[in-house]
Amino acid sequence: MAAPRLPPARALSGVMVPAPIQDLEALRALTALFKEQRNRETAPRTIFQRVLDILKKSSHAVELACRDPSQVENLASSLQLITECFRCLRNACIECSVNQNSIRNLDAIGVAVDLILLFRELRVEQESLLTAFRCGLQFLGNIASRNEDSQSIVWVHAFPELFLSCLNHPDKKIVAYSSMILFTSLNHERMKELEENLNIAIDVIDAYQKHPESEWPFLIITDLFLKSPELVQAMFPKLNNQERVTLLDLMIAKITSDEPLTKDDIPVFLRHAELIASTFVDQCKTVLKLASEEPPDDEEALATIRLLDVLCEMTVNTELLGYLQVFPGLLERVIDLLRVIHVAGKETTNIFSNCGCVRAEGDISNVAEGFKSHLIRLIGNLCYKNKDNQDKVNELDGIPLILDNCNISDSNPFLTQWVIYAIRNLTEDNSQNQDLIAKMEEQGLADASLLKKVGFEVEKKGEKLILKSTRDTPKP
């Protein structure tokens, strides 16, 4: 590669040009050359040493500005050089492990991290400073890309301070680039270190919440966090309601993805199922606050609803269903909660009444009806081909409760759909439950029109009442 030389000074048209200007021109030429793979592969190590020398020298001005804020105004030329040094090194590392190794062995990673931390310390949002900041992060991302040795050094220098400084930065590009570095550097062992620095993990959740279009926070959560049940269990209690909803939404997205959970995913999601089910059993009654006269906490209700949503999606998976069908207290708590909500909606006018409606977020337009629908859906899932649970619902008087919810919710076809599904699963190969519903109709506790609405009819053969289905089972 015919690289430009970097002498201390030179004359242009008889005028001596200061070294910083000359360096800047040469650096820009190098940056352009390193866009080509052949130039990257033939670059001599001495060039990187010279670039690093310029970077170190220029960083002194930033150090001075950190000690004396009045010097910030004098940073322009130094920031230009720093930016171009980072661009040059960034380009040199693209798909070139030889350059990655050469630059790493010059301790450029430590110099870059120290300088980036100085940028954050300045807390000045000048565009020139932000540009240098971004280019520094891009360099760290490129030198670590597909290079385990570089990833290790980046981790040593960057964790935890750089991530704590950058993941919550107001500039979305800085958030994205620091997320890229975190994603690139994390491995199984380093995930354990993250468990001891949960603020970083929470900052990633917040970053995705603020910048859902950014792929790096999304990938960190879905490809790394959700594969570490230990991290999720440690982090979940420390999340606020909005952060919980964000994490649970991504868990739902993972479960319902076009790509089914793999054999390796199942043990991990069984651990997640334990966390979600136990949290729901312990905290689900917080949704009853919505029936109070005080203004409801929509965020708390939405977090509770998302727990239920996750359980509904988990119980569609055969491996997870078996675990949740026998989870202690889950079915009982769901029936109990459905009963309390149903009674609350009948006794007073509140969000659980037919007319109650609260706008929450996204596709949830009616919190109460959606919550009841999913409670009934979960009961149906938990009773799928499980006679013990079918009988338990009967013992807890859950069948009349489910039918009565359908009776008062003519305006909610979504709820009716899940009542049909639940009754179908409750009566499948269960003559006792079939007889109960048939007798309810005979005694006037369930009229024929209601049973017809949910897809059943009672037929009398001699002295025996037979419950018959009139439609196919809807998909869960």
Swiss-Prot record:
Native organism: Pongo abelii
Entry keyword annotation includes Nucleotide-binding = no
Output this protein's name. Answer: Ataxin-10
PTM comment:
Polyubiquitinated. Phosphorylation at Ser-13 by AURKB promotes the association of ATXN10 with PLK1. Phosphorylation at Ser-78 and Thr-83 by PLK1 may play a role in the regulation of cytokinesis and may stimulate the proteasome-mediated degradation of ATXN10.
Residues bearing Phosphothreonine? T83
A Gene Ontology cellular component where this protein is annotated is: cytosol
Where primarily located? cytoplasm
Q: Which residues carry this modification: Phosphoserine?
A: S13, S78, S431
Query: Which positions does the record annotate as the modified residue Omega-N-methylarginine?
Result: R10
Q: Which function does this protein serve?
A: May play a role in the regulation of cytokinesis. May play a role in signaling by stimulating protein glycosylation. Induces neuritogenesis by activating the Ras-MAP kinase pathway and is necessary for the survival of cerebellar neurons. Does not appear to play a major role in ciliogenesis.
